């Protein structure tokens, strides 16, 4: 198989004009409200699939979510795509996204957002099985090497797999946030920063767990946000108000969490870390509302 250049080094694929679209889609849209149905250009989607096939030689490509007329996924208008490869993919999902953006820039597309999942056959048979069954049973198969056998999504099991993760991770996030408030009041800003970072990660894991009925091996806060950036424009804007496409708050918390564990000097300023505690509390409220709305949707499908 030919080697795909590392386009992540040749361009910062995060630097795109996301915020105008995100602000427009967030305005007037309640938390957890389903995205408005939008028609897509089959030619545009066909070109996206062609680029994906050039890069990773997939087993199949599935369109799911609102654009497929299925259970809504992204609140932002986006191509929700699940790409399945026979073996371990030759690149990571963010590398494929960078390659796709290089070959078919968002400015050239009517729908600029692409929510891309790249999984092996082994992953969709195990860790991602409930998410895969939902996407395959309701979505549109855009490409497949072989005839696809659709199995109905068992929303009973999907619901409880999602609920278990929500209760676990949101509970842990609440504990970390409470401890962070106590550390802040005691003037231990090093510990406050560490606990706030842990709370933010648990919240993002709760959101991932509810939407995918699965765990993730991602732990860097900025990468977790990038992984789920199309789920909620309101969350995206809350965590990156500087509109840098690389959340300063999450970047700083990633650094503080590492430094608090391994460096003698880790001295965040009270004003900075106090602001992060407050914003993480708002993040908690928003993610809990998103998760409850999503769980209610699954419950209706049971």
List each language-model region with its residue ranges.
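Short hydrophobic/aromatic beta-strand micro-patches
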Residues: 82-86
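Catalytic core of pol beta-like nucleotidyltransferases
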Residues: 2-57, 68-75, 87-186, 190-195, ...
